[in-house]
Design a protein with these regions (language model features):
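Short catalytic/ligand-binding loop motif for oxyanion handling, primarily in non-cytosolic enzymes
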Residues: 28, 35-37, 75-77, 127, ...
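Short amphipathic alpha-helical coupling segments at ligand-binding clamshell hinges
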Residues: 168-180
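Periplasmic-binding protein-like
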Residues: 44, 179-210
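Extracytoplasmic/periplasmic substrate-binding proteins
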Residues: 101-171
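Conserved C-terminal helix/tail region of periplasmic/extracytoplasmic solute-binding proteins
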Residues: 202, 206-283
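Helix-loop-helix "hinge/cap" segment bordering the ligand-binding cleft or interdomain interface
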Residues: 3-114, 165-171
């Protein structure tokens, strides 16, 4: 319902539509980010195409990819899911069997990656926010993010703006949001007043602005092939999410689960954690 207040032509509609609007407040994304893995393409002779499926990506022939995905899957475990909780229904969006399967696959993947001991010739793990690191020499890279279980990619909201709808001046609050998301503010040009400009050259501390031209500007130093890859990845972002306590819960589960010595102990940790989650959702 809030989309009608904004100029969608200048904003990343997919990111903005992930906002939260209820009877009490409106929370709208301002910046977002996701991790990218970049390899010099000529260093990946075994791969002609990077899979968009998480399990297939983890099993690709190229050892460098197996290793980096294995290492990062522990750090970004929560991103292998999209949303995991339905807050309205107070239920998990994945079955216990699905969660356990991903746990087992991730533990096995991390174990395999540690055993590879492969020398990774990658440009590095970069975030969308640090995209310029891939530019300079116009090197052609193979660039990809970590897919989630649905086969798309997850973007995380890194900064958001919000208003309380029960304020004494709700119309002014909405007008403030409209101003904040205007091209004048997001582009850095500022708003022209009588003898000065206000809200000019605003810089966000983290993430990429929801303003479409911001990402285009950041990509200018990249090779044409790299720019094309980034644009394709942007189109394949299927989930946009706010960070939550469930990120920590998922990563904690993985850490405890893989620390167990046998399957019986793993099963005990898993059942105990799921039960704790169910109780937490009902509060």
């Amino acid at each position: 319902p809030y989309m009608k207040y904004f100029d969608i032509d200048i904003l990343e509609e997919k990111i903005l539509s992930a906002g939260v609007a209820n009877e009490e407040q409106i929370l709208l994304p301002m910046t977002y980010d996701y991790f990218l893995y970049a390899f010099t393409t000529q260093d990946l002779p075994e791969n002609t195409k990077i899979s968009r499926n998480w399990l297939e990506l983890a099993r690709q022939k190229e050892k460098a990819i197996q290793q980096i995905v294995g290492q990062r899957s522990g750090i970004q475990f929560f991103n292998t899911f999209s949303e995991i909780v339905d807050y309205k229904k107070k239920t998990l969006l994945y079955s216990e069997e699905q969660i356990k399967k991903v746990l087992d696959e991730t533990v096995a993947l991390k174990t395999r990656s540690l055993a590879l001991n492969w020398e990774i010739k990658d440009t590095g793990v970069v975030s969308l926010n640090d995209l310029e690191e891939l530019g300079g020499e116009k090197t052609v890279h193979t660039v990809f993010p970590m897919p989630n279980q649905e086969g798309g990619f997850t973007a995380n909201v890194t900064l958001y703006a919000g208003i309380n709808k029960n304020t004494k001046q709700p119309l002014k609050a909405v007008s403030f949001l409209q101003m904040l998301y205007s091209e004048e503010v997001l582009s850095g040009k500022g708003i022209a007043l009588e003898d000065r400009r206000e809200a000019s050259n605003i810089r966000f501390p983290q993430g990429v602005s929801i303003y479409k031209k911001e990402l285009e500007k950041r990509m200018r130093s990249l090779s044409r092939q790299d720019q094309k890859q980034i644009k394709t990845i942007q189109e394949e972002v299927k989930t946009v999410r706010f960070y939550s306590v469930w990120d920590r819960e998922l990563n904690s589960l993985l850490s405890k689960y893989e620390a167990q010595e046998d399957e019986k102990q793993k099963e005990h940790v898993f059942i105990k954690t799921i039960q704790k989650w169910k109780e937490k959702m009902q509060k």
